[in-house]
Amino acid sequence: MSSRLHNGNDVYEKAEEYWSRASQDVNGMLGGFETLHTPDITVSKRFIEGLKKRNLFGSYDYALDCGAGIGRVTKHLLMPLFKKVDMEDLVEELIVSSEQYIGSDPRIGEKFIEGIQTFAPPERRYDLIWIQWVSGHLVDEDLVAFFKRCVKGLKPGGCIVLKDNVTNHEKRLFDDEDHSWTRTEPELMEAFNGADLDMVVKTIQTGFPKEIYPVKIFALKPRRQETSDDN
């Protein structure tokens, strides 16, 4: 797969440089496409509520926002739903800016300043782990390893959600500006399988301009968890 042609550490360093230069506002977090914010949050909220109705995660107690930036998703999607939300991001300046963007709020838990290529969520803490527009920065082996660490971060019955661009081309595409890959859906399914995750729900983002890559949302459950009653 093409990510093996790139050195992971080199890609990660360049991605950090890119996001360190991004404006610390919603427009910066969305790569200049601020108008995506409202339809993005609307569809994501509907997706989470649908998961809860189907009992695909236990409660609205604790969520984790991976690649949180200044906290756009934390503030507008997760905080209105969950009692407590932790944030993770590689860029310290963005996490620091989140305090001003979100304000002081007891629903904000820990803020982790670390890249997802090494970040290990606290074990058995989260009902929902939300991963949006950040997985494309990881090479294949690091993506699978990250998913495995996320599984350990789930409470029993918890759920992982991946929301990201997906290409309809035969092969993934590499963005030389932000140093990320847009993977194909079969490549993502391969990564899920490598981490023993089953994709239990999938939807496509609506309301985005046609020139934007398709954005899909995947709900993932640990395979062993799903089959434990049969063992």
Curated annotation (Swiss-Prot):
Cell division listed as a keyword: no
Keywords: Methyltransferase, S-adenosyl-L-methionine, Transferase
A Pfam entry, by short name: Methyltransf_PK
Protein name per its UniProtKB record: Alpha N-terminal protein methyltransferase 1
Job description of the protein: Alpha-N-methyltransferase that methylates the N-terminus of target proteins containing the N-terminal motif [Ala/Pro/Ser]-Pro-Lys when the initiator Met is cleaved. Specifically catalyzes mono-, di- or tri-methylation of exposed alpha-amino group of Ala or Ser residue in the [Ala/Ser]-Pro-Lys motif and mono- or di-methylation of Pro in the Pro-Pro-Lys motif.
Keyword Transmembrane helix: no
Reaction catalysed by this enzyme: N-terminal L-alanyl-L-prolyl-L-lysyl-[protein] + 3 S-adenosyl-L-methionine = N-terminal N,N,N-trimethyl-L-alanyl-L-prolyl-L-lysyl-[protein] + 3 S-adenosyl-L-homocysteine + 3 H(+); N-terminal L-seryl-L-prolyl-L-lysyl-[protein] + 3 S-adenosyl-L-methionine = N-terminal N,N,N-trimethyl-L-seryl-L-prolyl-L-lysyl-[protein] + 3 S-adenosyl-L-homocysteine + 3 H(+); N-terminal L-prolyl-L-prolyl-L-lysyl-[protein] + 2 S-adenosyl-L-methionine = N-terminal N,N-dimethyl-L-prolyl-L-prolyl-L-lysyl-[protein] + 2 S-adenosyl-L-homocysteine + 2 H(+)
EC number: 2.1.1.244
Residue positions binding S-adenosyl-L-methionine: G67, R72, D89, L90, V91, I116, Q117, Q132
Swiss-Prot/TrEMBL GO biological process terms: methylation
Enzyme superclass (EC): transferase
Organism (species): Caenorhabditis briggsae
